Regions:
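A conserved short beta-strand
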Residues: 171-181
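C-terminal catalytic histidine-bearing segment of alpha/beta-hydrolase fold enzymes
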Residues: 220-270
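Serine-hydrolase catalytic machinery in alpha/beta-hydrolase-like enzymes
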Residues: 32-145, 239-242
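Acidic catalytic loop of the alpha/beta-hydrolase fold
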Residues: 203-207
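Short alpha-helix in the alpha/beta-hydrolase fold that links the catalytic acid
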Residues: 87, 208-218
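Gly/Ala-rich beta-loop-alpha elbow adjacent to hydrolase catalytic centers
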Residues: 154-158, 162
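Alpha/beta-hydrolase fold nucleophile elbow
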Residues: 144-155
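Short beta-strand/loop motif that positions the catalytic acidic residue
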Residues: 198-200
């Protein structure tokens, strides 16, 4: 496979650390950010979808007959929340059928202890996780308004699950990982047959810069094309929670969003 690594500068590091100076923090903070970043688009537009067992997913489709590409959104460690549903709405506005998956069978955690219990319970049964996402992908592919092209997008816990799905799930065309757990074994990564998108945080204490560099090195060794960036001034969870520190998080979150839109356009765009 011909490698088309999209990281901008390969000297001397495996990949570039993207500075928030790409865009002025003050300029971004004073502007209206897109709803995908702040969840400010108003009432939710979608509906609950029971697509697998007790999974209560959230489905929203764009206007028009299509056909449209599809995205599966995979939640953070606390479960499927309205914040992820808001991103699904934003994806529909961009022209994609969006299904926010539910990997916790309708449950959400309200504190770190509950969140970690849900993470451990579900990661202990990876077959069920993959079956859940397989069902989501098959549902999307079977829709009359679907192009049959599917991407997964996951944050934190969901980012790691998205990578696992890229290794062992039904056919899909794109995987976007936001600060999720990684692998650095080229032999395993050779099973991926599509470009990988990655957004990571330079101040992340759980997914280190070294870990991300090893991941990119392994992707390159495996011949997997990728668009992976680290944003140096932010920490874990920044993209879904810009409002917690907008002065610092707005610029990198907006850059990551624009990269994601370009990635989806070239991988699943109709």
């Amino acid at each position: 496979m011909t490698q088309t690594l999209r990281t901008k500068n390969l000297k001397p590091l495996v990949f570039v650390v993207v500075l928030t100076a790409l865009v002025s923090r003050a300029d971004i903070a004073s502007e209206s950010l897109p709803p995908a970043l702040l969840g400010s688009a108003g009432p939710l537009q979608g509906e609950t979808l029971n697509y697998y067992g007790n999974a209560a997913g959230y489905l929203v489709a764009p206007e028009g007959q299509g056909p449209h590409g599809s995205v599966i959104l995979i939640h953070e460690w606390n479960g499927l929340t309205d914040r992820v549903r808001e991103v699904a709405d934003a994806m529909a506005t961009e022209g994609y059928i969006a299904l926010a998956a539910d990997l916790y069978s309708g449950r959400t955690g309200s504190n770190p202890r509950e969140n970690m219990a849900l993470v451990r319970e579900t990661l202990a049964d990876p077959g069920t996780l993959i079956a859940n996402l397989d069902a989501a992908a098959r549902y999307l592919n079977a829709r009359h308004d679907s192009t049959g092209k599917v991407a997964t997008i996951g944050w934190c816990y969901g980012g790691g699950v998205a990578l696992s799905f890229a290794l062992g799930g039904v056919e899909h065309q794109a995987t976007a990982i936001f600060y999720g757990r990684l692998l650095d074994d080229p032999e395993q990564l050779k099973r991926i047959d599509h470009e990988i998108y990655g957004t990571f945080a330079g101040q992340d204490r759980s997914i280190s810069v070294d870990a991300v560099n090893r991941f990119v090195t392994a992707l390159r060794s495996a011949g997997v094309p990728n668009d992976v960036h680290i944003y140096d001034s932010v920490n874990h969870g920044f993209w879904l929670h810009v409002d917690a520190n907008p002065e610092v998080r707005s610029a990198p979150a907006l850059d990551a969003w624009n990269r994601l839109k370009r990635y989806l356009a070239r991988t699943i765009g109709s």
